[in-house]
UniProtKB/Swiss-Prot annotation:
This is Translation initiation factor 5A. It comes from Archaeoglobus fulgidus (strain ATCC 49558 / DSM 4304 / JCM 9628 / NBRC 100126 / VC-16). It is found in: Cytoplasm. InterPro entries: IF5A-like, IF5A-like_N, NA-bd_OB-fold, Rib_uL2_dom2, Trans_elong_IF5A_hypusine_site, Transl_elong_IF5A_arc, Transl_elong_IF5A_C, Translation_prot_SH3-like_sf. One of its GO terms (biological process) is positive regulation of translational elongation.
């Protein structure tokens, strides 16, 4: 899910959709309005799920999509290689996610993890 807001309402550390990918905002710089135009904002962001840097330039009055990013808890059912089978602790839905490199040694059956969900994508963020 996503909602529309004006560019002037965005803040560093917030989220924005760039190229249909939810991104975390790293920096926002606003240029002053010129003789024949409105102020423009340059937004530098990094993809939540693919860690790719992206940037856009928009007028501050333009509307832009902001993803709704949810943090949820899940229990590890099993770990096979670098794929973990998880069960959401609220909906009891089971699904598989790739295990981040830094968490591979900590993944054990029965432990809990925090994962991000936005625009139909999921990612393990950290251990609970």
């Amino acid at each position: 899910m996503k909602q529309q807001v004006e560019v002037r309402q965005l803040r560093e550390g917030g989220y924005v959709v760039i190229d249909d990918e939810p991104c975390e905002i790293l920096s926002i710089s606003v240029s002053k309005p010129g003789k024949h135009g409105a102020a423009k904002a340059r937004i530098d962001a990094i993809g939540i799920f693919d860690s790719q840097k992206r940037s856009i330039v928009q007028p501050v009055t333009a509307k832009i999509y902001v993803p709704i990013v949810e943090r949820k808890r899940a229990q590890i059912i099993s770990v096979t290689g670098n794929v973990a089978q998880l069960m959401d602790l609220e909906t009891y839905e089971t699904f598989e996610l790739e295990v981040p490199e830094e968490l591979k040694d900590k993944m054990e059956q029965g432990r809990e993890v925090i994962y991000l969900e936005s625009l139909g994508k999921r990612k393990i963020e950290r251990m609970a």
